[in-house]
A protein has these predicted regions:
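Terminal amphipathic alpha-helical/low-complexity segments used for targeting or macromolecular assembly
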Residues: 1-5, 10-11, 16-17, 53, ...
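Structural signal for interior beta-strand "rungs" in well-ordered beta-sheet cores
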Residues: 2-186
Length: 265
């Protein structure tokens, strides 16, 4: 059901069984997938591509133009996957010419008052708690949890299955499978609870833990640690994912937690 007090631009494409509550505005060049519900006072702007069975709660703004002074009105998009929930007052900006799109995967939960800036790429099954803020050009892997009030600096990458504790400022890349906390943000262990919930065996979790002991606990520099990991740790998808992630870093990798890190903050 589309409420008569909703405005939908004639060029927008609305799938079957979509429900839109009153006082919502759907701009041109928008596509909304089957079975999606959009609450009242939502604004869906140009370039939005919203998947099937999504839920978008009141007062959210989807696909607004980037908050980037270099943006010159080029046609870009915001992609939202199937079964994703966007809670109250979330803002998501569309891409710039850098990536041409901002994308959020399937089965994500973006909680109230969160902000996702231009050119972010968010994987599947992610949870962003209230007031999570992502600057532009951020890449987040699958199954990532960002606790409330987390702020992520532009161009940072967060690896799959990572967990970042509430109130964190993320300035450096966060590798896959880890738990990150403290200030400055540091490795404080493997995300064992999240991995168990996703079906990882104890053997697999210990395998990942062995990798991060070499990288963060034994005191090696990154290049030496990677060399030891490749020599001593059996080949696995998880090992290769971690090595590739670290080698591709642009901003650098967060450190392991020590009392000295905290003293220097």
């Amino acid at each position: 059901m589309i409420h008569p007090l909703t405005y939908i631009h004639p060029d927008a494409k609305i799938g079957p069984n979509v429900k839109i509550d009153p006082f919502t505005t759907i701009h041109r060049n928008v596509e909304i997938g089957e079975g999606t519900w959009i609450g009242s006072n939502v604004t869906v702007m140009e370039g939005a591509r919203i998947g099937k069975n999504c839920k978008i709660f009141p007062s959210s703004v989807i696909s607004a133009i980037p908050q980037d002074l270099k943006f010159r009105g080029e046609e870009t998009h915001t992609l939202i996957g199937d079964n994703t929930t966007i809670r109250e007052c979330v803002t998501i900006n569309r891409g710039t010419s850098d990536r041409n799109q901002t994308s959020i995967g399937n089965n994500c939960l973006i909680m109230a008052y969160s902000h996702i800036a231009h050119d972010c790429e968010i994987g599947n099954n992610c949870i962003f708690s209230n007031n999570t803020t992502l600057a532009g050009h951020i890449t987040v892997g699958d199954n990532v949890v960002l606790a409330g009030l987390t702020a992520v600096q532009q161009f940072v990458r967060i690896g799959s299955f990572a967990f970042v504790t509430g109130g964190s400022l993320v300035r450096k890349d966060v590798p896959p499978f880890v738990k990150a906390a403290r200030e400055p943000l540091s490795y404080v262990g493997v995300n064992s609870v999240g991995l168990k919930r996703r079906g990882f065996s104890l053997e697999k979790i210990n395998h990942i833990l062995d990798i991060y002991r070499i990288l963060f606990v034994r005191g090696y520099n990154v290049s030496k640690a990677l060399s030891i990991i490749e020599t001593e740790i059996p080949v696995s998808d998880e090992r290769d994912e971690i090595i590739t992630f670290i080698r591709e870093t642009g901003r650098g990798i967060m450190k392991g937690y020590t009392r000295r890190n905290e003293d220097l903050a």
